[in-house]
């Protein structure tokens, strides 16, 4: 049997194991080791199994992962999220639908230091949903805004998804973060406009909150200082070369730790944050070990090159290839976790993108945005299920219905990024 056929069988086995709910990291590890052994030898596969974990764990760039996770966990447990929503509520709450806009804005700002969509969605739901329910907001609108706002964490830097894509494709982490800045902020603006349009079409879904004076609005900006301070120090430091993205992650984590200690985080809370960080980091690293092992198998099977040759034979233009891959990501996103989808598929599709001369940074932004859509779409929609767990009294169908306008908004944003690549590459020019 040829190596390409073994590669195709391996990908089929990968799909079967995932359908059987075998953990994604273990699935990639099994397929990678067995496939590599079939093409090369069992001795080589065992030797690889010994070296790959060391390669991953000793990779300097990967050390940014636990730092970004720690930063988000500390922000979630230190009370920063509550103060953040209080500030945005005072600024926007007097508008019709203003609390939903405040929730989306809070999600965008919180995600700037959490790096995780699920952490952003769960934290801000705990803080913002009770307030929106108190004012009689339609539950679909309220939870839909939070589910959509949570997805901003996967794009606005620092983003764990962008970091993993950069490492898997050997791109500059700093370039990926800079490329995600405008698309992330564009998402924040478009979500706010979506709420405004929904309120215009269906004004009964929400009411205006209590109006506040301009002096109070200006004073409330102090609640944004910790977030903007940490975010700007990291992003500007990375952009101007003061430190690497990995060092920037450590700077951000240290600054967040200082804030948490000043605000009274002590002993048990701090230890719980460290434990949560270690648990989440272990999951990510196990997946990366599996992805690296799978990547070696895909490389020796040469299946990516076979797919590339087939595409060349079909005489498809690069943009058509990109659209086909994004359509595949959109479908996969309905069933798979976002990080799992990246680590499984990027080793397969990246050689194709590279061979066709497509900008890998631009493609990475499109990929992550399409993955972001999967966090909101049924049947899986991880953000939706996180919010359902936080608000069991709200029906799942109600949340998915509330998310629908934001899915349309994201499709429009994806279209803009495809038509105008400069939106992704502006800070790289």
Predicted regions and their residues:
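Alpha-helical transmembrane segments of multi-pass membrane transport proteins
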Residues: 1-429
């Amino acid at each position: 049997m040829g190596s390409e056929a073994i590669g195709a069988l391996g990908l089929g086995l990968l799909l079967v194991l995932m359908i059987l709910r075998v953990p994604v990291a273990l699935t990639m590890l099994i397929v990678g080791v067995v496939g590599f052994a079939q093409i090369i030898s069992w001795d080589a596969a065992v030797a690889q199994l010994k070296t790959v974990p060391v390669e991953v764990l000793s990779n300097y760039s990967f050390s940014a992962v636990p730092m970004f996770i720690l930063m988000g966990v500390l922000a979630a447990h230190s009370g920063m999220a509550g103060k953040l929503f209080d500030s945005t509520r005072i600024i926007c709450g007097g508008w019709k639908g203003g609390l939903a806009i405040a929730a989306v804005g809070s999600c965008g700002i919180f995600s700037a230091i959490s790096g995780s969509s699920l952490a952003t969605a769960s934290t801000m739901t705990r803080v913002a949903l009770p307030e929106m329910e108190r004012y009689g907001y339609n539950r679909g609108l309220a939870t839909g805004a939070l589910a959509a706002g949570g997805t901003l964490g996967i794009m606005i830097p620092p983003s764990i998804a962008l970091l993993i894509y950069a490492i898997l494709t050997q791109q500059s982490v700093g370039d990926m973060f800079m490329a995600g800045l405008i698309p992330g902020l564009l998402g924040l603006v478009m979500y706010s406009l979506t709420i405004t349009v929904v309120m215009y079409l269906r004004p009964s879904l929400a009411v205006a909150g209590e109006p506040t004076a301009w002096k109070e609005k200006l004073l409330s900006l102090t609640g944004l200082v910790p977030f903007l301070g940490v975010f700007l120090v990291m992003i500007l430091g990375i952009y101007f070369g003061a430190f690497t993205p990995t060092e920037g992650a450590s700077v951000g984590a240290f600054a967040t730790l200082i804030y948490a200690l000043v605000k009274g985080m002590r002993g048990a809370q701090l230890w719980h944050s460290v434990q949560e960080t270690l648990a989440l980091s272990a999951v990510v690293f196990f997946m990366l070990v599996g992805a690296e092992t799978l990547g070696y198998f895909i490389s020796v099977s040469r299946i990516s090159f076979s797919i590339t040759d087939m595409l060349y034979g079909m005489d498809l233009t690069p943009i058509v290839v990109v659209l086909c891959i994004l359509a595949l990501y959109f479908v996969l996103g309905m069933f798979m976790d976002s990080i799992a989808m990246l680590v499984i598929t990027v080793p397969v599709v990246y050689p194709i993108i590279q061979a066709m001369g497509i900008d890998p940074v631009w493609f990475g932004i499109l990929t992550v945005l399409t993955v972001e859509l999967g966090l909101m779409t049924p049947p899986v929609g991880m953000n939706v299920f996180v919010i359902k767990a936080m608000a069991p009294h709200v029906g799942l169908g109600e949340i998915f219905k509330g998310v629908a306008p934001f899915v349309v908004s994201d499709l429009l944003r994806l279209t803009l990024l495809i038509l105008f690549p400069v939106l992704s590459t502006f800070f790289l020019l």
